[in-house]
Amino acid sequence: MGVTAVVLLLIAKVWLHFDPAGLLPLTLSQQDGLLGIGLGLGITLASAGIYQIWPDYRKNADNYLTMVLQPLHWPDLLWLGLLPGLSEELLFRGVMLPAIGLNQLGILVSGTSFGVLHMSSLQQWPYMVWATVVGLALAYSAVVTGNLLVPVVAHVVVNLVSSMVWKLRHQQRLPSKD
């Protein structure tokens, strides 16, 4: 998780060095912060709904989240929320999106690239499809608001809430040590 975040940050830094488009602004705004929280909660609820009705997605989400979350302890979940939320949004929405264009093509390329990053194997395609939809929504929010804060906050919320729910559900399944 930490290594991936550093690699993504380095890619973003190198990209910014060579690309005159620059970085999408990140402006602290209560309204955009609340919009990011709302978007993050909406994405999380939509994911929960898809989890219930799409068996292939459920299987792939469980496999992916087991791989990522099982070795983590509760305090690590804070880092899981912050590191990918910041590094992935900086690269995909902060740097890539303005470089390609704050338009439909930019949204499509940014969202699809984000989805592909979340595919650990070809069998994980249902999870990649959902991650692509999420990437499109995050890119759209960045274009509409012109503020990187919205997708960053949304991404952090999705990661934090999803990981806490997963940990709670799987903690209850463990046998007691009595």
Annotate each PLM feature.
Residues 53, 57, 66-178:
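Transmembrane helix-loop-helix hairpins at the membrane interface
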Residues 1-68, 72-84, 160-178:
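Specific transmembrane helices
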